[in-house]
Structures are given as structure tokens and as C-alpha cells.
């Protein structure tokens, strides 16, 4: 019996050694790879995305974007660095997953039944609808029934293609479209804006952000209902990455981080006003250049473009603006506030901007330290508009109604209640025009988004023009004449061949003499 046991032990050890040697060559070995362990061993989370105002963008060397900030937080959660790769279109994103060049796709992608057959979706964090857009002043289609491929162009890999195919089969048999393999949704939106393209389809949030900079972009109709947005990873037997994503999103949902980031990028509202936005951008071109140095000089700790947006909301950048209540100037300061700040002339542009900036800094300093850094400005602006005491009442009301007093998303929803007697009668400082403070802050945020995007667009155009000038520098006639093939000499020698008829330039000489 003892010998038999020894033989079994030997066979067992031999079997284990053989299995260990053959393990990497077993066909399903790759499927059991621990994705999280691989990411942490590499020390880098590889994320592919698309360059857009919502997902990922770089402004003055600083990175922004809803998906970028979430991806950075997830990388921190895993204890690794973040590597972002920007692709031109959705099709290229999924190519990165297929080739193993990306761990995650974080680009505002929509959950779709066709996609989840081949890729693993993550938690859903907001929703969008797909909309058909056109340029203001052009024909607006009221239905997809008459839209054809000569008018409608879609980016490759766009989820709406599946919806269009279903609509073609069930409702609109004449519906057709074209897929441009070389362009992404952002480029196609720009071509609709410029008039090069009749229609394209994009998600409602991206369109809303584009309209802040390009008010001539208009929505013709909704192509789909609301659809959830999610991240995607490879679909296999290893669920470690999916589990980590679920834990991560649960944690940022519980601590309020997700709500703050969504408020930052999605909280600007969707009540787009074409006339107001167009008027604002005209003022950016015609009025702002004179005031810009003053905004930059006195902005200090806040973004000068935010200070400029506040001033436009207050006075439309009119130094002589006066309200029925007596507030005056670019920053619409009261007489008492101006005196407390040592100002002598509220209609003087520099005094008004410097005073308004200092008053806003005072409001920010009063905001409780429990409020997150990136949301303090909104509390300060509400206090700037309706008074600090009423802002405290709004926080108190938020607590009483089971909200978070440190969350701007929660507090701003209670602002309109400050003018309703059942609520203000129970507050310390009573009645306030909370609905006006709500609109005030929301308008400033919209102007800031428009200003940042518009200035970024102008910088991009100027950079492209400069590069074009460098690649193709202007040449004077004198420089041309010094060239190996002197241009002026050629013209003088060829004058006998130049006629009013272009066709005669290439007529043989003998035929001309004949």
C-alpha cells in the first residue's frame, strides 16, 4: 500500500508538471487572462476616444472632457497611469479593441443590441437621442421619407446605421444614406455647418454643445428615442475589468463624484436660443477685443472667460448699462457695493471689472469648505446675484428636502422654491427671486461654453492659416524673376503668343501663320 501511494504521488506530480508546461498552448488559455492584472502589471490603462467638446479635448495644453475625467479617475482607482489615444471615428475605436491596442473605449458610445454581441458594455451613465441636423436657412426635412444618400452622410461605425436600416425596412423604403469611411461625426457636423453637406446624424448632447459655438446648426428631427451611453471593452470569459468598472461607477455614484462631473459637462441645459447665441458671438468679435485685456488683468484665480461671461450676462458688455433698480456698469454693481469696494465711477470699464472680480472673490471665500472646489464658483455666482444670505437659505432648504447642500445639482433645483411662500416662509431670510438666480447661473455657464469653444475655434483657424502660409509662402515678382526660370522674362518673351482666346495659346505656329 505504501508503494502504491508513492506511485500515485509520482503520477500526480508528473501530471501537474505536464499541465503547467502545456497550459499556455491550450486554446482557451487567452480567454482566462486577468485583464485587471495585466493593466496593473503594465502600469497603464489604455483608453481610445474621439476628439470632441464632450468626450476629450485639449485647450491651452490642458485636457478636458467628461469621458477623459472619468477615465482619469478610473486609472487612479486602479493605481495606474492613463494613456489616451484619439481616433477619427467610431469604427477606428472598435478596431483598437479588436487589435488589443485599447483596454477601454470611452467616447460617449451608445448601448446597442448589435454591439453587445461582440463587445462588453460597462455601466450606463447618461443618455442621448440621435438627431438629424441641417444648416439654418437650408431646407428642413420633416420626415426621413424623402432623405437620400446624396443628402445624408453618416460616420463609419455609427450606431444609428442599424436604426436607419430598421426604419428603411419598416417605414421609409426610399430612405438611403452614405457612409464616409474617412470622416468622423465631428468633421461631418462641421461640413453641415459650412454648407458642404446637407444632413448628418449625431447625438443630442454633442449637437447641443456644437450649437453654443455654431448657432447655425439646427435640429431637423429625432431619429431615435433616448439611448443609454456606456464604455466598451473586449468580450471574453474574463470579467475582472467589468467588475472593476462596476465597483468604480458605484463608488463615484455614492460619493457624488459622478453627479459633479455630469453637472460640469451636461448641466448647461438644452434650451438653445439661436438669436441670443448669435448676438453673443457677434459681440465676441466686435466688443470683447477691447475689454479682453481688462478681464485677463483682474480675473486672477478664476478663468477670465468666465469673468467675461458674467459681465455679458450682467450688461451685454455695455459700460453705461443701468437697470431700473439702480445697478450700473459692466458688472452691474449697486452703489453700496461700489462704495464698499472703493470705486468712484461704476461706468468706468476698468473700475467696474476690477470691482466685480473682487466682489466675486469675496463670495467664493464665503462658500463653505465642504463644497467641492470645481463647484464653488456656481454657489458664489448664485450669492453674487441674490445675496449670500439667500444662498445659505437654499442650502438649508436642500437639507430639509433630502438633498445634498454641497452639490450644485441638488441646490440649484431648490432655487426656484425660494420665491414660493410654503417654502420661504419657513426660511431664515425669507423671500428671494431664486428662479432668477437659477437662470442667471445657467446663462453664464452657456456663455462661458460658447466663448471657450468659439475662441478655441478661432485659434485653430489661425494656426491652420499660419501653417498654410509657412508651407506656401508668398513670393514677390522680383523673387520670381531671380528664379532659375525667370517668370517676368518668360512673360516678356511670350507676349507674342498671348491672345484673348485661350485656345490659341496651344495652336501650332505654322497653323497660326497660315
UniProtKB/Swiss-Prot annotation:
Its main location: membrane. In the N-terminal section; belongs to the bacterial solute-binding protein 3 family. In the C-terminal section; belongs to the transglycosylase Slt family. NCBIfam families: PRK10859.1 (NF008112). Residues 270-514 are annotated as: LT domain. It is an enzyme of class 4 (lyase). It is found in: Cell outer membrane. The N-terminal domain does not have lytic activity and probably modulates enzymatic activity. The C-terminal domain is the catalytic active domain. PROSITE patterns: TRANSGLYCOSYLASE (PS00922). CDD domains: MLTF-like, PBP2_YfhD_N. It comes from the Bacteria. Coiled coil: none annotated. Murein-degrading enzyme that degrades murein glycan strands and insoluble, high-molecular weight murein sacculi, with the concomitant formation of a 1,6-anhydromuramoyl product. Lytic transglycosylases (LTs) play an integral role in the metabolism of the peptidoglycan (PG) sacculus. Their lytic action creates space within the PG sacculus to allow for its expansion as well as for the insertion of various structures such as secretion systems and flagella. One of its GO terms (cellular component) is cell outer membrane. It catalyses: Exolytic cleavage of the (1->4)-beta-glycosidic linkage between N-acetylmuramic acid (MurNAc) and N-acetylglucosamine (GlcNAc) residues in peptidoglycan, from either the reducing or the non-reducing ends of the peptidoglycan chains, with concomitant formation of a 1,6-anhydrobond in the MurNAc residue. Residues 1-30 form the signal peptide. Pfam families: SBP_bac_3, SLT. Residues 31-269 are annotated as: Non-LT domain. The active site is at residue 314. GO terms for biological process: cell wall macromolecule catabolic process; cell wall organization; peptidoglycan catabolic process. Its EC number is 4.2.2.n1. It is a peripheral membrane protein. This is Membrane-bound lytic murein transglycosylase F. InterPro entries: Lysozyme-like_dom_sf, MltF, Solute-binding_3/MltF_N, Transglyc_AS, Transglycosylase_SLT_dom_1. GO terms for molecular function: peptidoglycan lytic transglycosylase activity. SUPFAM superfamilies: Lysozyme-like, Periplasmic binding protein-like II. Keywords: Cell outer membrane, Cell wall biogenesis/degradation, Lyase, Membrane, Signal.
